[in-house]
């Protein structure tokens, strides 16, 4: 596979014309949108009409409004048999593409063949007023309609407002845009920008303690009882216990979301051979469940079990009922993990009572994209209907879709409160597949920015490469231009955050296991995708899954190689120090070795200088490297991800489904390759275990002669270290390590020889 050029995937600093970055514009009217370029629009708000003349035999009409500006035309919906219609519709025409000097508003009557003309009104664009927030909205006015000759008609007026503004206008999000003139009225909803909120997620704990007075179907048989606990599509089961008064005391944790839709359903089941008999059932509404905010236990309650469903809270008289002892509560002290822990955008607990005050503000300007790959074919040409999705905390934002452009300009700005700097904002770019049909939204790429890597109150304007990994290899699908500013409201609180635990206290007081967290994260992803998919326009499941990095933990050869090289890169400093020290010991540079001898003597004479010297050295290194500190935020690195040199078969394996959908021969080949890799890892792990077992065998007397020698050596060293000053021992040890090569030999040292002869448990392995 041919390797891509390095510059193609590099981060580029840009200089957009934005107020926040100090750009100078000739327009004195500015807005709060200071991280994006101003886009000029002509707005036409069509409110209503009255006393329209009839055009059919009944004296009525089916009116609608058509707004024409050059080659662009926007149309409202029509009303049947109504002479006083109300539309309240806003049209936004981009002034970058205007090729006309006036705008025409026509009122027409909907007909089967040719629509009839009712009246019109024209406006000279040079006379249209300008309005930018925080100015109050422009009040609409009544205008008498004119005929085609320009004369006033007898009856018929239209109320509308027309003004020039920017994308900061309140009418912008819900307006019809000239950029989407080819989109039908039904598809306009799917291209509008929206703000979404993730559902409030809770961990829900059920402690199944015991049952009492169970009534099995066969009275002479001791039942094998298990309890099945279900919430929505989540279900867990206790172990089997015998008897009519069984006890379990098992904990189960589920994920649920407000508003609570699914009840908690408890089934007590008796296993009779291969069949299961339900001995009792209880339904509990989650809205009635208490909430816990700390580690203090809540009291347990007895609940009646019925053969038929009994909703908790409803009054129903029963003479006798089996009971189940449960401790149920919603956990408000945990943070429900719905993202990968490496890219979390929110670390607060579920309960708002436990939230701390915010430390700052994150402002994101989504300016434009360049060179996007065509994702579909329309009229024989490749095109893209791109939109962006940004997620930080529970707030998701979606820009409007720019139809038919590989270089779209959004210029939309959004703001989030920041509660922890160790969080990540994620921006994804997608192709809208729902404009002309029900296809899926295609992924173009995404960008992650960690807030702790940003300087406060500085505006970062960069063009980020959009990179995706396909079965054919790594591919750049374009670039997205962003402006980011992290403002700090309390510098002390922000620094204090660095001393606090990453997650809420409950994660450490009562930690959940790794297996539980993985399972709960999976169900949390499903809940978030389901709730956001109900919005209008919906945020599709494929978009939510991509933003939440669903499936990121699935194994692949590429990821394993990337992590291995990351470890080697982290250890490269220690390896370099080791090589440098080896050169010192072998007198490769005599002057440096002599200086190390002098330093060693000073530190041994004054041992109290050792720790201050180490910290002073680290301080000087940090100050020295400040001059070369990173000036740009981090971005996707194909070399760090090992995506530039990955083979085709490894990529095909990475994109395989789980469980696999490949043929048996291919799976056998990959299995053999995995066995080969695992064999090498197994050898390394075995060698480490051997060294550890040799260390333990020093005093285990497995080798009696070796243990006797070691014990005798320890006794001698105890006396030597007791009577010899520490400085003398340190000097002698240092001089021995730094001795001249003429006093060295290539054979292993005595301690190494002794250690390698110690027994390990390899002899006991099959």
Predicted regions and their residues:
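Calcium-regulated, polybasic anionic-phospholipid
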Residues: 41-83, 208-246, 366-406, 433
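Short Pro-Gly-centered beta-turn/loop motif in secreted/extracellular proteins
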Residues: 92-100, 253-262, 415-423
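Hydrophobic lipid-interacting interfaces of membrane-associated proteins
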Residues: 49-50, 209-214, 367-372, 489, ...
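Transmembrane alpha-helices of multi-pass eukaryotic membrane proteins
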Residues: 89, 250-253, 412-413, 589-618, ...
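Intrinsically disordered, low-complexity PEST-like regions enriched in Ser/Thr and acidic residues
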Residues: 3-42, 175-203, 339-361
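Extended cytosolic scaffolds built from alpha-helical repeats
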Residues: 508-627, 636-638, 713
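Multipass alpha-helical transmembrane domains of eukaryotic endomembrane proteins
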Residues: 554-590, 630-718, 740-766
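C2 and C2-like phospholipid-binding beta-sandwich domains
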Residues: 1-17, 30-32, 47, 64, ...
